[in-house]
Design a protein with these regions (language model features):
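C-terminal structural segments of small proteins and small subunits
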Residues: 112-125
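Long, well-ordered early-domain segments
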Residues: 99, 118, 131-134
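Ribosome large-subunit tunnel/peptidyl-transferase-proximal elements
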Residues: 1-103, 109, 113, 136-153
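Acidic, Mg2+-coordinating catalytic module of metal-dependent nucleases/exonucleases
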Residues: 125-141
Length: 153
């Protein structure tokens, strides 16, 4: 008989990822799997047993090809003719480099209240420093997972 994990048995770990020269889509897939808990053998789609992810150096994230200038994120205000679009380049000009990764991860999660709760486990910071040092996050090396995860210049 298969057992489900109880809330009292869930343990949340902390992971730290350096986003320097990381490809946005590849980084977002790794983060979404960790946040949902798919990296654990106790994964269950209706339970929130994912881990916390701290991403640093978000301003040094990379896009492949010409997506930095040409990719468009759409949203709608709800009014007629209210469709808005913005590119990653314009988001960086507005000092919102974390929105690019947050949108990518959010759109990889299933929609619903559980996904909103899981998205709060993603902590994004510019620069090297972050306030989560006391949780002793485990450093994830993106290049060791797959050498295509980083862009080498």
């Amino acid at each position: 008989m298969t057992k489900f994990v109880k809330k009292s048995e869930i343990s949340n770990d902390w992971y730290e990822i350096d986003a320097k020269n990381a490809v946005v889509g590849r980084l977002a897939t790794i983060i979404s799997k960790i946040i949902r808990g798919k990296n654990k053998n106790t994964y269950s789609p209706h339970m929130d047993d994912g881990d916390f992810v701290v991403v640093k150096n978000i301003e040094k994230i990379k896009f492949t090809g010409s997506k930095y200038q040409n990719k468009k994120y759409y949203r709608h205000t709800g009014h007629p003719g209210g469709i808005k679009e913005i590119t990653p380049e314009k988001l960086n000009e507005k000092n919102k480099p974390s929105e690019v990764l947050k949108l990518a991860v959010k759109r990889m999660l299933p929609s619903g209240p559980l996904a909103k709760k899981q998205l709060t486990k993603l902590k994004i910071y510019t620069g090297e420093n972050h306030p989560h040092g006391t949780q002793n996050p485990t450093m994830l090396e993106l290049s060791k997972l797959n050498n295509k995860n980083l862009i080498r210049n």
